[in-house]
């Protein structure tokens, strides 16, 4: 009888551990989903800022109106 009770106790402990691990896995998965949403949002914001920064930088190529006319012969 001792052996049967020990086995039942071990099975109960394993079931508890499995239940705890399943719950923890679900919670960790939810954290990963939330982090991915945050990363996606930051990525969009970064792309916007990069484009905004590019628009602010002066171009090294002068526009036609700013070019000095070529010398005439």
UniProtKB/Swiss-Prot annotation:
HAMAP family: SlyX. Pfam families: SlyX. Belongs to the SlyX family. NCBIfam families: PRK02119.1 (NF002556). This is Protein SlyX homolog. PANTHER family: PROTEIN SLYX (PTHR36508:SF1). Gene3D superfamilies: 1.20.5.300. InterPro entries: SlyX.
């Amino acid at each position: 009888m001792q052996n049967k009770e020990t086995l039942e106790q071990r099975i109960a402990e394993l079931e508890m551990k499995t239940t705890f691990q399943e719950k923890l896995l679900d919670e960790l998965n939810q954290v990963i989903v939330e982090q991915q949403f945050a990363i996606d949002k930051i990525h969009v914001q970064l792309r916007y800022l990069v484009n905004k920064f590019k628009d602010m930088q002066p171009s090294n190529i002068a526009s036609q109106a700013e070019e000095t006319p070529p010398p005439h012969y």
